[in-house]
Structure formats: C-alpha cells, structure tokens
C-alpha cells in the first residue's frame, strides 16, 4: 500500500535518510494518519525512472506523478471529479513547522527529521505551491486537526488542504 510520496533532502547509505517530509493526495474523506490514508496500488499501474514516477492510487481513483529537478520536485495530481479532494503534508516528528497561506495557494515549513549524523541545527525547508485555490485548509499536530490556526510548530505537525476538482 502507498502511504505517501516521501521527499528527502538527501538519501544517504551512510547516515540514512534525513530531511524527509511527505505529501499524499486523496479523495472522499480526509485521513491524516499515514496508515489510514494508504491506498492500494499495482506495480502494473506504476512507472518509475530516475526522472519520473507515476502511480495510480486505486483507493482514491486518481494518479500521482512526480518529476524531480536539481532543487525541487514537481507533482501532478489527476483527481476524479470531487468536492472533497485533499492533499496532506506531513513534516514528520523530531521537530517540525508548517504554515498554510491560503491567499497564495501555498504551504511553507520545515522538518528536522533525521537518523543522526547531521548538525544539531539541521532543517530542511519546503515551499509547496498549488495552482488551484483551497476550499479547505487546516494544520494538525500528532494526527489531530488544530482549529483556528494556519501555522504550527511542534514535535510532529502537518497541513491538510482541500479542493473541488473536475475530472482530469
């Protein structure tokens, strides 16, 4: 099952992954916990190369694509027609920060998640921009939505945004 699309500052065979955070699109019901939001997929409906990854998420009847660049990655989510399409950003534990900026269709933040071997002040910053306005936006801590806030810093935080989508 596909639980998320994980982004890393640097995968390393010597000190493991560090600076990782994840992005997961979904439809129907918002699910923040990575195990409950997981979707079935088939390797037959997956394409993986060093420069492109695509997978059909059968649980949500949608396709997710990622194309990495030297400094960032481009995502494309092909949703079905839905009034409840979401994207969850998980900045993981060990200290993280997120801020949703609805007027700019943007989420910014950082993660300090690592497996050791990095400086004490290590942070991997991210900026996520969307090409559609949000119809829903929340932040969460320890898998619980936090009301009345669009910015949060704690051990384990994330953001959830929603859209109304047309097919394709």
What are these regions (language model features)?
Residues 1-4, 8-167:
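Accessory carbohydrate-recognition regions in carbohydrate-active enzymes
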């Amino acid at each position: 099952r596909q639980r998320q699309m994980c982004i890393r500052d640097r995968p390393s065979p010597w000190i493991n992954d560090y600076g990782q955070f994840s992005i997961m699109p979904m439809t129907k019901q918002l699910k923040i916990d990575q195990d409950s939001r997981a979707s079935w997929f088939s390797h037959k409906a997956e394409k993986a190369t060093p420069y492109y990854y695509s997978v059909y998420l059968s649980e949500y009847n949608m396709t997710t694509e990622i194309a990495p660049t030297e400094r960032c990655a481009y995502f494309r989510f092909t949703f079905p027609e839905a009034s409840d399409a979401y994207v969850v950003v998980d900045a993981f534990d060990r200290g993280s920060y997120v801020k949703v900026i609805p007027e700019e269709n943007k989420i910014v933040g950082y993660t300090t998640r690592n497996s050791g071997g990095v400086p004490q002040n290590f942070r991997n910053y991210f900026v996520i921009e969307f090409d559609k306005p949000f119809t829903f936006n929340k932040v969460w801590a320890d898998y619980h939505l936090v009301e009345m806030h669009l910015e949060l810093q704690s051990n384990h935080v994330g953001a959830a945004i929603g859209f109304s989508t047309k097919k394709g």
